[in-house]
Swiss-Prot record:
Record-linked Gene3D superfamilies: Collagenase (Catalytic Domain) (3.40.390.10), Disintegrin domain (4.10.70.10)
Annotated S-S bridges: 320-404, 360-388, 361-371, 475-495, 653-663, 657-669, 671-680
Transmembrane segments: 702-722
Native source species: Homo sapiens
Tissue specificity statement from the Swiss-Prot or TrEMBL entry: Expressed in all tissues, except liver, with high expression in placenta, lung, spleen and veins.
Protein name according to UniProt: Disintegrin and metalloproteinase domain-containing protein 33
Intervals, Cytoplasmic compartment: 723-813
GN (gene name): ADAM33
């Protein structure tokens, strides 16, 4: 009798129950239930007391830096942690709502938090992101193939935080969400959760980077899923922000959280299972928020599940735009890194990044996390942005997008007392290079945040080798037609805030208007989609195709996701219609859709763009004409409508500039060279009150430019006199009509040697004098026959030893 495995009674039922427990719950994403890990008790290693461990049960303050010892699978690990000092911006606030619906705004110390980043000693490719608010929780990555998650066990709510568990990320299964409508029908929709973001080096104060001032909102459903615990909900948002910061650092973008908000009583904007409707309702609410609390981007994190497998949505290239700088994401994972990866992905779309096509992500394999802009969210812990994403980001910045990211968080906002060592230069500090143990700044004393002897500065784009750059040194070049340059002031180490041309300023040689710092034109948008050979289709294409109100031609969607047909006057603001070109690397996941219309008895091809099903749900606005695009004389596209805009603010500003300058986004004059701000009505160097002085330290250069402007008109006359003086054998004669060569004073019959630098010299004539009066004839040099013929000049012959001509004595006046 053969051996057969024994099967316990009820096994099928137990397996079914187990699958039901492990099957993903919409909106939760990560499999619910306890995944067994290895018990571990991490300990702080106190500075000054080597290897004396302190249990987490003991009260320990939240140090700026510290070491944590723990064991994972029999291996001793020493975590080198540093508080993320720049996570919360100066002036950071927290908002929730009381029972009466009134907002309650708190301004906690923006440096007193418990969110860390770091590495594992002895593992060069490691990275760590930890929260130490209640026990310890977070990701520990040793290498591409070894990632762990640490968390308290028993879970939060218990008063015993001394016991934790650590497990490999491969043990955790997660929901494989995509950007399409496809619902999984089997376990193929499940995937292992790999390791997380890539490690980064110590922050370099002098390195130029962008700053994303972020505002995060938790909706009412998320508050309920956190058991109505306000502190737990806020900590969830802070953990997400810490991960988003880690991910965006790979693009040289630093997150500064300006505020978080929890909708404790009810949703302040409509939140439904329709991602599109939820997004536009939130963006409408966000406009009111921005007026009270300026920020660069607002992100809504919801506890609801969107229809299908959608986990996030954001407008393409919406960053810094009043109507579209934001996004929505579902909190689809038990672990905060899942929501953070989705949020970073949607922020990427706001920055003009599309999904990575196949073969684009070579920086990280899928099993080790992949890249952030992957179309599917089956790998919720991506390591980096791909080279394709970086290329798209550079293109976005080159055309003027994301102008608001150039400005660091406003240090003038009300903040708690300064804390030396937090990485922010605050009131009373000359510099701040972070905690003293790791400060390597040669310009700054870490212990008291003061400059070293002889140092003028320590940080900033206008600081080099501890010295301020001179006033007028360029610190930020203009990016695109609608940007303006900024210059060092000579008194500050920081470049002045970025400003750009005021909305409505003409750009692209008059074919467009500046809008939010960019110059959107149909030509530029066609070439972005279909390459350099593409151009806008005739207006008839827009009129016919966009009147259909379908996926191929429309003026956007309503709150229910239905396509809207374009009215006749709005046709140029719907789906972009082009001709020529081919798919561009800057717009993967887009396929051309050609339509044919009849125009003047001929067939005309109109090319639109349609997103592939795998890309369309979290990319809002793909293939549509960008806001601010010119659609008629003094008319621009706004909210898919062609609206007349008198640009009255621009006209008022230009009037004040006396026709000698342009207007910037602060409604101040940016003067042309030769005119001085603020009103461009007096001589000066150009620039504006906001740009910093334009070469103010180089007065000689300015005087030289003014001198040249006077002397340049005289150069032709001076050149003529020189030529007449140097021409071979040229007797110049004064006559009633000017000056001409005298044949008697000419050189060889065949002219100069053909290889001489002068080549063939042609006779030159000058017209009458400036006064119009003829010059008096000189009887000695007139053309009348002379009774005393001149002595003949010697013949000129080329020098066989040199490639030059022997020049005769010059003719004089």
């Amino acid at each position: 009798m053969g051996w057969r495995p024994r099967r316990a009674r009820g096994t099928p039922l137990l397996l079914l129950l187990l699958l039901l427990l492990l099957w993903p719950v919409p909106g939760a994403g990560v499999l619910q239930g306890h995944i067994p890990g290895q018990p571990v008790t991490p300990h702080w290693v106190l500075d000054g007391q080597p290897w004396r461990t302190v249990s987490l049960e003991e009260p320990v303050s939240k140090p700026d830096m510290g070491l944590v010892a723990l064991e994972a699978e029999g291996q001793e690990l020493l975590l080198e942690l540093e508080k993320n000092h720049r996570l919360l911006a100066p002036g950071y606030i927290e908002t929730h709502y009381g029972p009466d619906g009134q907002p309650v705004v708190l301004a906690p110390n923006h440096t007193d938090h418990c969110h860390y980043q770091g590495r594992v000693r002895g593992f060069p490719d490691s990275w760590v992101v930890l929260c130490t608010c209640s026990g310890m929780s977070g990701l520990i990555t040793l290498s591409r193939n070894a990632s762990y998650y640490l968390r308290p066990w028993p879970p939060r709510g218990s008063k015993d935080f001394s016991t934790h568990e650590i497990f490999r990320m491969e043990q955790l299964l997660t929901w494989k969400g995509t950007c399409g409508h496809r619902d999984p029908g089997n376990k193929a929709g499940m995937t292992s959760l790999p390791g997380g973001p890539q490690s980064r080096g110590r922050r370099e104060a002098r390195r130029t980077r962008k700053y994303l001032e972020l505002y995060i909102v938790a909706d009412h459903t998320l508050f309920l899923t956190r058991h109505r615990n306000l502190n737990h909900t806020k900590q969830r948002l802070l953990e997400v922000a810490n991960y988003v910061d880690q991910l965006l650092r790979t693009l040289d973008i630093q997150v500064a959280l300006t505020g978080l908000e929890v909708w404790t009583e009810r949703d302040r904007s409509r939140v439904t299972q329709d991602a599109n409707a939820t997004l536009w309702a939130f963006l409408q609410w966000r406009r009111g928020l921005w007026a009270q609390r300026p920020h660069d981007s607002a992100q809504l994190l919801t506890g609801r599940a969107f229809q299908g497998a959608t986990v996030g949505l954001a407008p393409v290239e919406g960053m810094c735009r009043a109507e579209s700088s934001g996004g929505v994401s579902t909190d689809h994972s038990e672990l905060p890194i899942g929501a953070a990866a989705t949020m970073a992905h949607e922020i990427g779309h706001s920055l003009g990044l599309s999904h990575d096509p196949d073969g684009c992500c070579v920086e990280a394999a899928a099993e080790s996390g992949g890249c952030v802009m992957a179309a599917a969210t089956g790998h919720p812990f991506p390591r980096v942005f791909s080279a394709c994403s970086r290329r798209q980001l550079r293109a976005f910045f080159r055309k003027g997008g994301g102008a608001c990211l150039s400005n660091a968080p406003d240090p003038g906002l009300p903040v708690p007392p300064a804390l030396c060592g937090n990485g922010f230069v605050e009131a009373g500090e000359e510099c701040d290079c972070g905690p003293g143990q790791e400060c390597r700044d040669l310009c700054c004393f870490a212990h008291n945040c003061s400059l070293r002897p002889g140092a003028q500065c320590a940080h900033g784009d206008c600081c080099v080798r501890c010295l301020l750059k001179p006033a007028g040194a360029l610190c930020r070049q203009a990016m695109g037609d609608c940007d303006l340059p900024e210059f060092c002031t000579g008194t500050s180490s920081h470049c002045p805030p970025d400003v750009y041309l005021l909305d409505g300023s003409p750009c692209a040689r008059g074919s467009g208007y500046c809008w939010d710092g960019a110059c959107p034109t149909l030509e530029q948008q066609c070439q972005q989609l279909w390459g350099p050979g593409s151009h806008p289709a005739p207006e008839a294409c827009f009129q016919v195709v966009n009147s259909a109100g379908d996926a191929h031609g429309n003026c956007g969607q309503d709150s229910e996701g239905h396509f809207l047909p374009c009215a006749g006057r709005d046709a140029l603001c719907g789906k972009l219609q082009c001709q020529g070109g081919k798919p561009s690397l800057l717009a993967p996941h887009m396929v051309p859709v050609d339509s044919t219309v009849h125009l003047d008895g001929q067939e005309v091809t109109c090319r639109g763009a349609l997103a592939l099903p795998s890309a369309q749900l979290d990319l809002l606005g793909l293939g549509l004409v960008e806001p601010g695009t010119q659609c008629g004389p003094r008319m621009v596209c706004q909210s898919r409508r062609c609206r007349k805009n008198a640009f009255q603010e621009l006209q008022r500003c230009l009037t004040a500039c006396h026709s000698h300058g342009v207007c910037n986004s602060n409604h101040n004059c940016h003067c042309a060279p030769g005119w001085a701000p603020p009103f461009c009505d007096k001589p000066g160097f150009g620039g504006s009150m906001d740009s910093g002085p334009v070469q103010a330290e180089n007065h000689d250069t300015f005087l030289l430019a003014m001198l040249l402007s006077v002397l340049l008109p005289l150069l032709p006359g001076a050149g003529l006199a020189w030529c007449c003086y140097r021409l071979p054998g040229a007797h110049l004669q004064r006559c009633s009509w000017g000056c001409r060569r005298d044949p008697a004073c000419s050189g060889p019959k065949d002219g100069p040697h053909r290889d001489h630098p002068l080549g063939g010299v042609h006779p030159m004539e000058l017209g009458p004098t400036a006064t119009g009066q003829p010059w008096p004839l000189d009887p000695e040099n007139s053309h009348e026959p002379s009774s005393h013929p001149e002595k003949p000049l010697p013949a000129v012959s080329p020098d066989p030893q040199a490639d030059q001509v022997q020049m005769p004595r010059s003719c004089l006046w």
